[in-house]
């Protein structure tokens, strides 16, 4: 097999950012499970395996300038882009390597507090999975955390053959991969319309195919068109990672910690009767029909004493990361649609609107008077899982990190003059990426340059032959585009800009 071992190299992966990779988010999960976490205000070492274009690693390195970040990807084009972004931002604490997993282990690397890998485990050969296990065994510290996400059974059971169909269709063509993807999607849709038994007997595939047609083609190239493509039962992954002396700690997807919104009473009862913890996770995946897991494994667990755990929970600091008016109490969970209690969630949001608070401070806040500690705790876990809140640092630490995140954000915003690929900016307050689209980034640039926002954005777009598309219709005239941009700027200045300022982004 060639050096790329069946992995798609014809087009680069997307500039994605994955919030589960944030050290603060991973440490929160550890605390919820009553385990001691690395001290994130001191030096620590962090490694991302298969970092793609390095966007997540670069962003996180800017949020934690006291730490050292390392990452590999065997696609040289990805590493060139990752290093270029780091150089442009002046980020000195991040190191990228265009090594395979087998080669990377031979570099002069430290022992790591965190090793993370997003999705790649499903797209590589058994030999490369073994190389990852070997790397983790040698390079993770005792007490270190490993984040691994992967396609999961039984959730992929129905759709897995559809991926195989599209991959095989693409094999029969020598056209560029993006063209093969379009034709494979069309061919699959024709089979659905022709009522092939596979589709008629698996009705969940129709909406899934519709969703695929809407997705970024560069993402589909890597998600659906690798020669190696696997979905795993949880126990299969856990067994492979045992060789690296890893034990399952819990999920990085925080909603998983609240059974009340995931499982019926009957399911919870049956699950509680499963005594083997590994098999219990497998059974849980059957109840939820899980198709993607976000797991945290640890090499050795240091449990907190009950009083230590209570103190750690009380010291957890949270910040709102969305405008308060955008928060919806009606939410869709695995168990179905749930209306979150307004008398609990609304006061918490109002208290956090003024700035980050610890769980202990929230308990004493006048706005949350009468809400029990357990209700506060569960609400914050759910809101963080949804993406409304996020763990935060104190003001002193935020100020220490402001310079490095400003430099990273400046590099990204400058790129927005030419591209919409980079859609996250770094927040020193919450130590993670916040979604900020191209129009918003251009408005921030206009503000910095003391220029009229709508006019500045229109000059950039029109110089590139671009026009605003509103509700599926292209706005043709300059007046129409400027009018729309004025409305966008007004809404941005009223809601988003104050939030971004609090998050240390604007």
UniProtKB/Swiss-Prot annotation:
SUPFAM superfamilies: S-adenosyl-L-methionine-dependent methyltransferases
Pfam families: Methyltransf_31, MethyTransf_Reg
InterPro entries attached to this UniProt entry: Methyltranfer_dom, MeTrfase_reg_dom_prd, SAM-dependent_MTases_sf
Signal peptide residues on this chain, from the entry's feature table: none
Family label: To R.prowazekii RP789, RP027 and RP028.
Name assigned to this protein: Uncharacterized protein sll1526
Organism of origin: Synechocystis sp. (strain ATCC 27184 / PCC 6803 / Kazusa)
